Amino acid sequence: MVLLAAAVCTKAGKAIVSRQFVEMTRTRIEGLLAAFPKLMNTGKQHTFVETESVRYVYQPMEKLYMVLITTKNSNILEDLETLRLFSRVIPEYCRALEENEISEHCFDLIFAFDEIVALGYRENVNLAQIRTFTEMDSHEEKVFRAVRETQEREAKAEMRRKAKELQQARRDAERQGKKAPGFGGFGSSAVSGGSTAAMITETIIETDKPKVAPAPARPSGPSKALKLGAKGKEVDNFVDKLKSEGETIMSSSMGKRTSEATKMHAPPINMESVHMKIEEKITLTCGRDGGLQNMELHGMIMLRISDDKYGRIRLHVENEDKKGVQLQTHPNVDKKLFTAESLIGLKNPEKSFPVNSDVGVLKWRLQTTEESFIPLTINCWPSESGNGCDVNIEYELQEDNLELNDVVITIPLPSGVGAPVIGEIDGEYRHDSRRNTLEWCLPVIDAKNKSGSLEFSIAGQPNDFFPVQVSFVSKKNYCNIQVTKVTQVDGNSPVRFSTETTFLVDKYEIL
């Protein structure tokens, strides 16, 4: 079977969306679709018509047609089966079978069509697999949007709460000022009230940085000296109040140093004309008493070529994985070549990879409940005492070849019981009194720093300290799949390339 094109058109032959799987000009495909309605015979029940050069296999969809254009020597049974799959794909992305709806989701349909057919030949996929393949790239964006919306809601709520607190503090200060002898009359009270109002305005503007102490405002007007003094006292009182609540207050210079250290930790990558991005994401759920409930890891090699002279290349893949991952190549990649020689190249060696776009050429997946596969084990042991709970938390790196950076282990705390009393700790900690969490921060966990512990005491019950959540990033991938060499198709000469490897957490919980 050789499929030339798949299209959705009107009954008059106007193309709404069309995907060509062979070299074909726009004029040619529009001419074929325009001739299609004239060939149909309404008196017959056939679902295909033929011309001297091509065959149309079609299915009516209300006021539209789903049309496959194939060669005349193709297998009509396979054509009909493929047509049914195309017809089932369209309602997945379009709520109504109308021209406007099809046009609005044209790119989604084209991506789905590409999963069904590659270079004119049907791929062995079903509807569920097509849905999975096309939605995979948008998962990260959905997570990012959800996190951003949550942060915006929390920031607005925090802004309103802070404004109410500061207004209440102003009213209390005014009441105390009227009762205190020799306060200075209405003039001083008016100046103090004005500076407090300015402080409320600035706090609302700066709510995106709730943990940074606000700097004094620039003075303006004739009473600038009084405002500076009042402002400084109000800020000091506000900072002392936050510290009493358990907040960590950073100065602006400390914030700059932290930002600079983060930038130094992640130096820019020198990208060559051929650049590979290897990314893995892990989703893991463990029980508090031990045992792995589920672990799922997804990985992908993305290829980006910035110079068209390196379009016809092959990637030499070294797979040292011993955990049993499932590998899957892109439909346009020669699967036989990859299976036999671990080479990633196009089925048609005369074609080139796309230029200036990220192309996923290899995916892999690992799903297991084998406890020995856990990269970083976390043991949380809360034990009740007379005044609450003594909590011991330990971590241990099980994969010695990994180096985990920016590790944060987040432990929930009971609300309304104050800050925890920290005993022994490896690394640093942050207490967030608003979210009632304790964050255990470790800059690096590797073979030289495989294990560590944290001890603290606080009022509460053992169930209050779960679920424990973990986040980290790593420049070494978990499954040990690497691109070791890149060569050109013609002459097998080596090509310079760069690689960027990232292993990060999608979800990592101890329930």
UniProtKB/Swiss-Prot annotation:
Cystine crosslinks: none
Residues of the signal peptide: none
CDD domains given in the database record: AP_delta-COPI_MHD, Delta_COP_N
Region (Disordered): 168-188
Entry keywords, A to Z: Acetylation, Cytoplasm, Cytoplasmic vesicle, Dwarfism, ER-Golgi transport, Golgi apparatus, Membrane, Phosphoprotein, Protein transport, Transport
Subunit-structure text: Oligomeric complex that consists of at least the alpha, beta, beta', gamma, delta, epsilon and zeta subunits.
Family affiliation: Belongs to the adaptor complexes medium subunit family. Delta-COP subfamily.
Protein name (Swiss-Prot/TrEMBL): Coatomer subunit delta
Source organism of the structure: Homo sapiens (Human)
Gene this protein is translated from: ARCN1
